[in-house]
């Protein structure tokens, strides 16, 4: 059940009976007033202050313990075992010049041998071409000889048998005419 109000009589009496309640009301001072809350706006990511990246620390080569390049180990120094082998560059120019001279001599020798091989291959190609031309000339000469011999045979036969050649030609013509008159059937 909901609470019920008391009678109006009781309330009026209670106010009169309480001497402090009838005294003039003095308002209590509230605690210091707060300013009204303001909306906090988040900054956009495209804003210049947000886009600036923080500088990363750059380490020097000494701090990183990187191996030094282009250095040769002195004669007395022994490399520790297990260390990875790499290219070792020469510091002194005389040593480098001698190494370069050796390498260049090897390369020149290879180049010279390549040139020699190329010359030999060229000579072989030329020889093969000459052989092929000679073969073709032989074939042509044989063909011409065969043609001449056939012509000579026809000339010798044609002198005595001129009439027989003409009669065989007529029979060949008549047989070709009969073959030409064949019936043909066409389908639509």
Curated annotation (Swiss-Prot):
It is found in: Nucleus, Nucleolus. One of its GO terms (molecular function) is mRNA binding. GO terms for cellular component: nucleolus; preribosome, large subunit precursor. Keywords: Coiled coil, mRNA transport, Nucleus, Ribosome biogenesis, Transport. Residues 178-188 have a biased composition (Basic residues). Residues 1-89, 130-188 are annotated as: Disordered. Residues 163-173 have a biased composition (Polar residues). Residues 130-151 have a biased composition (Basic and acidic residues). It comes from the Eukaryota. InterPro entries: Loc1. Residues 103-157 form a coiled coil. GO terms for biological process: intracellular mRNA localization; mRNA transport; ribosomal large subunit biogenesis. PANTHER family: 60S RIBOSOMAL SUBUNIT ASSEMBLY/EXPORT PROTEIN LOC1, 60S RIBOSOMAL SUBUNIT ASSEMBLY_EXPORT PROTEIN LOC1. Belongs to the LOC1 family. Component of the 66S pre-ribosomal particle. Required for efficient assembly and nuclear export of the 60S ribosomal subunit. This is 60S ribosomal subunit assembly/export protein loc1.
């Amino acid at each position: 059940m909901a609470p019920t109000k008391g009678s109006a009589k009781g309330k009026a009496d209670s106010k009169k009976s309480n001497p402090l309640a009838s005294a003039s009301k003095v308002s209590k001072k509230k605690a210091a007033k707060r300013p009204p809350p303001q909306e906090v706006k988040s900054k956009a990511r495209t804003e210049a202050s947000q886009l600036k990246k923080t500088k990363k620390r750059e380490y020097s080569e000494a701090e990183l313990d990187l191996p030094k390049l282009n250095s040769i180990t002195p004669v007395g120094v022994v490399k520790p075992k297990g260390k990875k082998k790499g290219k070792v560059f020469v510091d002194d120019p005389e040593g480098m010049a001698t190494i370069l001279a050796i390498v260049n001599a090897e390369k020149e020798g290879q180049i010279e041998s390549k040139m020699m091989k190329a010359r030999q291959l060229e000579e072989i190609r030329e020889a093969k071409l000459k052989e092929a031309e000679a073969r073709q000339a032989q074939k042509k000469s044989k063909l011409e000889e065969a043609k001449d011999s056939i012509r000579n045979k026809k000339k010798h036969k044609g002198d005595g048998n001129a009439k027989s050649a003409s009669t065989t030609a007529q029979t060949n013509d008549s047989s070709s005419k009969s073959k030409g008159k064949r019936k043909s059937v066409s389908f639509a």
